[in-house]
Amino acid sequence: VQRKYVIVQDTREKLPLLFPKRLVMLDDTRPAPEKKAITVELHTVRQKLQTGDYILSGSESTCIVERKGSLLEISKNCLHGGDRRRFVRELVRLREETSHPVLVLEGSPAQLLDAGEGSLAVDALIRLLQEYGCELLLLPSGIAKHRRALGEWVARLLINRTLHD
């Protein structure tokens, strides 16, 4: 193991992502075509976060990940008055506190567009993310296998944002 990272997970996460203990990653000190790998060690700690759901300890200003677990949550956050105002405040805090705000939405494009207000919520979400400069990752989840894959993806995102900020 050549490097160690600590991922901080908000204590209010109801169904937290599952992070691996180790990751084999592309060595950032070598050119990518060399395909040199390094192993990094990950530790996860739970702590109440004021903004977002996941950060890399010591790199809070580089990247913050906010996770939304369902279309229903996004629909409420984007289309319904009080929830929308709260969601906009979250997006403002993300933009103010980090150079790379990321919203992870669990689900598939088909799920998002199939539900009754789904397509309207998608339009509202895209507009809000554009207005507040937030990146969107749309990834399936729900079962443990997907939460592990999503956890690995988020870990790689947090680490790589830190390496190249």
Language-model regions, residue ranges each:
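Non-catalytic C-terminal interaction segments of nucleic acid-processing enzymes
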Residues: 1-61, 72-165
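Conserved catalytic cores of phosphodiester-cleaving nucleases, focusing on short active-site segments
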Residues: 63-69
